Design a protein with these regions (language model features):
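Bacterial N-terminal signal peptides that target proteins for export
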Residues: 1-12
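N-terminal signal peptide c-region/cleavage motif recognized by signal peptidases
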Residues: 20-21
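Boundary at the C-terminal end of the N-terminal hydrophobic targeting segment
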Residues: 24-26
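Cysteine-centered motifs
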Residues: 16-17
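Active-site mouth of glycoside hydrolases
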Residues: 29-214
Length: 214
């Protein structure tokens, strides 16, 4: 069985290494075909290989002009600023058709708890994550889709130096994705995909658990 890192690698191959593929540009309220994977390609219902070109957003105020646009967990200002960036990119005529959406740990970490980098999950608060999934991440995903952008949602933070099936970080990812994948606004969404783990480095050899079906 494939572990979570192998699945992620295969997704990256399908997403980033598409050669001789059809262009698919975005515009507001465009019809977006459901994509599926064939080998290392994303393919539309007619069998055309689709090449995605896009950009990333992370919803931390520090990473967005060093906190000059919003702070103190201001949801309204965060949405206004980041939706405005999408509008500006589309209005400029950039040939984009997907958004990599980081569910930044700024929102899900307990305030005031010191962490050692983005791979430190000691401050992760599941209730905060659920709250801001509904208030920040899903609204941003839906807004992007409304502009004709496919969305790839990535988990809060990045992988530690080593990850193995059954370890603390693996259990953290399972908890996050179990909730996200079962959310009624995300489950089976035709235009939203999941990046199971970010910046994985070394995976320890271990037996893999059976894959889950959501």
């Amino acid at each position: 069985m494939k572990n979570i890192t192998n699945v992620f690698y295969e997704f990256l191959i399908a997403l980033c290494c598409l050669m001789s593929s059809s262009a698919l540009w975005a515009w507001e309220d465009m019809s977006m075909p459901r994509l599926h994977v064939e080998g290392r390609y994303l393919v539309d219902p007619h069998g055309n290989k689709v090449n995605l070109h896009g950009f990333a957003q992370t919803y931390s105020p520090w990473f967005n002009e060093m906190g000059q646009k919003w702070d103190n967990y201001d949801v309204e200002k965060c949405l206004k600023y980041n939706q405005g960036l999408i509008d500006d990119i589309m209005a400029a005529g950039w040939k984009m058709n997907f958004l990599r959406l980081h569910m930044d740990p700024y929102w899900s970490n307990s305030p005031g708890i010191h962490v050692e980098g983005e791979n430190d999950i000691s401050a992760f608060d599941f209730n905060r994550f659920k709250n801001y999934l509904d208030r920040v991440f899903i609204p941003m995903a839906e807004y992007a889709v409304s502009k004709g952008l496919y969305v790839v949602m990535r988990p809060p933070g990045v992988c530690p130096e080593k990850i193995a099936v059954g370890d603390e970080y693996n259990q953290y990812l399972i908890k996050v994705w179990t909730h996200v994948a079962q959310h009624p606004k995300l489950k089976n969404h035709p235009n939203i995909m999941f990046e199971l783990a970010s910046s994985s480095r070394t995976r320890r050899a271990t037996n893999c658990a059976m894959p889950r079906k959501y």
